[in-house]
């Protein structure tokens, strides 16, 4: 009986990890001078290793997702270009 309870608890723990929502981390930067805005990415495909393209006041950068909301994913689109944006 104890092994069944353990198996159920283990399964629930695994599912909560797999099914938990993921978000871009909240940026610690609140403002940026226009001449310092630089996009390292425009979409998630521009990032490596499972990181996402996240929008910050200083441009889009690749960051690993977190389980805490607050950040914003980059919108991308045809007008998005990598490099300095000015």
From Swiss-Prot:
GO terms for biological process: defense response to bacterium. It is found in: Secreted. The keyword Signal applies. Disulfide bonds join 24-54, 32-58, 41-53, 42-80, 47-62. InterPro entries: Elafin-like_sf. One of its GO terms (cellular component) is extracellular region. Expressed by the venom gland. Keywords: Antibiotic, Antimicrobial, Disulfide bond, Secreted, Signal, Toxin. One of its GO terms (molecular function) is toxin activity. Contains 5 disulfide bonds. The keyword Transferase does not apply. Residues 1-20 form the signal peptide. It comes from the Eukaryota. Residues 21-66 form the WAP domain. Has antibacterial activity. Belongs to the venom protein 11 family. 01 (wap-1) subfamily. This is U15-lycotoxin-Ls1c.
